[in-house]
Amino acid sequence: MTPASRPDWCLILLFLAVLRGESRYIQMREAAEDALFLLNSDFKRELSEGQIYRRSLRCIDMLSIEGQFTFQADRPQLHCALFLIGEPEEFIIIEYNFVNIDCIGGDILKVFDGWIIKGEKFPSSLDHPLSTMERYTDICEDGDVGSITRSSQNVAMIFFRVQQPGHGFTLTIRKIPNLFPCNVISQSMNGRFTMITPHQHRNCSFSIIYPVVIKIFDLTLGHFNELQLKKPPPKGCGDAGDFVELLGGAGLDPSKMFPLADLCHSFHGSAQMKIGCDNTVVRMVSSGNFINRVTFEYNQLDRQLEKKQGNSVEEACFPSD
């Protein structure tokens, strides 16, 4: 990871730490302008049935709960971003209740279907049905007050620039069920997930933004049987139309990550791998000819213990000492 992109990545990790509920209140300097975030699960449960949660937005912010959110500039804000994340089985709905920005004067309010940081996208261009430009919704050009945008996965992002103090906007964020989640960023460093593609020709990536131990318990691809590590020269699964691969890297975009293992054969049992990368991705490629299914469990990896244990692949992301 480049030094320029490291602060952005650390900010994402800090946001996700808050969402996990490690701290009920956390104060972020500079980037979040000393914002206090109340985003953990205990706070969600405190909201009574039917009550709408409301709060102000900061220039750099992140949301994991439903509610109505307002940004009002107290000074020119030129480079702002709002990260939205839901549970793996959720789509995000964004409704524009009130918009008071100067589009002609250079203000911006754009929604991106996914996350994008320093040009790296999730889902990657290989895993999303739309082109990069089609994934943007420009409220200044395409949207009206009352219009609605829906994400294609459990994450979305809003970019905005508001130059005039007192100007801003109000959004309502809702979640709706996604019966067959495809591309996912996990809020947690620990969990279990089953990815299913029912006769659909698409690629799906599950991203875990932590070093983790991955355990794959079950894989059904409609053919064969084996797990093979990618060691040069790899045989790989390139000729298979249906396979699962494990990726690791230091950025957001799965297409720019290291291929660590191919799984192109069905198996039932348990296969484990330790991945010492900042970001770990389980990616399923499906031809649409089968009902493909993979179940896996992930837990945060202790970097002090990862060397010389099992099938550690730490060297794929961190040079050896």
UniProtKB/Swiss-Prot annotation:
Signal peptide bounds: 1-21
Summarizing the function annotation, the protein's role is: Binds CRF and inactivates it. May prevent inappropriate pituitary-adrenal stimulation in pregnancy.
- For whether the record's keyword set contains Ribosomal protein, the answer is no
Predominant subcellular localization, coarse grouping: secreted
Got any disulfides in this one, which pairs? Answer: 59-80, 103-140, 182-204, 237-264, 277-317
Q: Which GO terms describe its molecular function?
A: corticotropin-releasing hormone binding
GO biological process: one example: negative regulation of corticotropin secretion
SUPFAM superfamilies reported for this sequence: Spermadhesin, CUB domain
Glycosylation sites (chain numbering):
203
Which protein, by its recorded name, is this?
A: Corticotropin-releasing factor-binding protein
* Compartment(s) of residence: Secreted
Please give the GO cellular component terms listed in this UniProt entry: extracellular space
Q: Which UniProt keywords apply?
A: Disulfide bond, Glycoprotein, Secreted, Signal
Asked if Electron transport is a keyword of the record, the answer is no
User: Which Pfam families does the entry link to?
Assistant: CRF-BP_C (PF23541), CRF-BP_N (PF05428)
According to its UniProt record, which protein family does this protein belong to? Belongs to the CRF-binding protein family.
Q: Which gene encodes it?
A: crhbp
